[in-house]
Amino acid sequence: MPRLTDSTDYAFAQAHFAPEKLWEFFDGDRASLNIAHECIDRHATDAARIAVRVAHADGRDEAVTFRDVADASARFAHWLARRGIGPGERVAIMLDPSHAFYAAMFGAMKRGAVAVPLFTLFGPEGVRLRVADCAPRVLLTTAEKAEAASGIPGVEVVVADDAWWAELATLPTGWEVATRADDMALFQYTSGTTRELPAAVKHTHRSIVVLMLAALYGTGIRPGDVFFCPSSPAWGHGLAHGTLAPLALGVTTGTYAGRFDPVRLMQALQEYRITNLSAAATHYRMMRTSGEAHRFRFAISKLSFTGEPIDAETLRFIDATFGVPACSMYGTTEVGVVLVNYPGAADFQVKPGSLGKPVPGLRVEVQRADGTPCAAGEIGEIKLFRRGEWVPTKDLGKVDEDGYFHHAGRADDVIISAGWTMSAVEIEDVLLQHPDVKEAAAIGVPDAVRGQVVKAFIVSPRAADDAFAKELQDFTRMRLSQHEYPRQVAFTAELPKTPAGKINRKLLRDAEATSAPARH
């Protein structure tokens, strides 16, 4: 009976996938399951086997073995037990990828507690809101970040310093896991603004099984891959697809710690001989705009991205630099990955710019507001059929004649001007094709005549003036249509972004909402 990892081909996946086969990858079952055991302990029999390689922004390389994490996480589980922190209680971890981070995250899950990774660049307000929401018993962080977390009632702030490691060293390296598959394992916060905190997405230990869909068909992980994901493990991509999925399959994963530098990333990709790369769209754009990619030699055979669509110029850069297609992996934190491009599949044609096709076993449709399926090429909302009902993603899309899905922006990124419906994503994609545009964001702003008009925010090294603004308007109008272009153009030094690196159009809309509508 073939295993799902025996081939990356699309036809093989369609012919051999069955949901029950996902359980073949794990020691646990539907009753008893523990993520820490599945990702770490069962792979730790070889003391030298590397679990994670961390490329630090300062140039350091850190290699952590499965045995290192197994021992330290067991000690951390004992450390929690000594403090009276029991199953179901939350343990917040505000650390960059490091031995300490993995020890704490997997140790909390061994204990049966709930691990809560927090982004290390949160300020006091961002930390306070999330801590107030999840109510952890302890928050583990660095000395530099301890002040941001101090003074929160009911939370013990602990610094992961030499004294902490010395205390752990006195504790046993064995721990018997006793969690059920449906016990809570992780809280993960999406990358919203601190003023509008998204609810934590809560994952049980069973979630590691469903995650294999994305691992097998979204990132294309197979035994023997040398994997890398630079996204922070505080976010869904870095946590699920960059950490848990490869480790569960026993694959060494690489990651990035510290302030992001695209040149440092490319250096790590070359030195680690990475064969499978999964990153956010922003990471690829930054590699392109660095102008330094030509200095490196890569060994990548599978490449995927997520977070937001990639513009055409960056797709061309990926093809020229890595020599493999950029495979979109689409989903949301709430529903998981649902549309993929099957990296490594010789029999699957990747359509540049498309979201691909559904993962095996999932039913995905683009629907009108009344719930009926859209015709080919018609824009509607992407929905997933789960547990007897259609689950909305709040993303717009369309399906072409060949069954490929295409993204058309968030539902709130649609701009309706004088009755015309326009996509912010399409306008941004065209603007980014201009050689003098480094970054672009498009939103709808109030207009007394048209209801809304498109306003583009541009980051460019070129001097900003009216002539450049008109050039961009004409550039867009000639490539899209006579009505689909930015009637307003603003130049800015930088665009607001979410902590996950996505352009935060909501902040731009909020700022514009305070201005009175104008005629154009």
Residue ranges and their predicted role:
Residues 62-67, 185-210, 336:
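Conserved AMP-binding A3 loop
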Residues 1-64, 68-81, 144, 154, ...:
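N-lobe entry segment of adenylate-forming
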Residues 48-106, 123-128, 204-206:
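Conserved AMP-binding/adenylate-forming core of the ANL superfamily
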Residues 274-279, 288-349, 363:
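Gly/Ser/Thr-rich phosphate-binding loop
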Residues 58-59, 138, 144-182:
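ANL superfamily adenylate-forming
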Residues 48-50, 171-192, 196-197, 220-226:
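Conserved pre-ATP/AMP-binding loop-to-beta segment of ANL
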Residues 122-125, 129, 139-141, 277, ...:
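AMP-binding/adenylate-forming catalytic core of the ANL superfamily
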Residues 209-229, 234-275, 290:
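Conserved AMP-binding/adenylation subdomain of ANL enzymes
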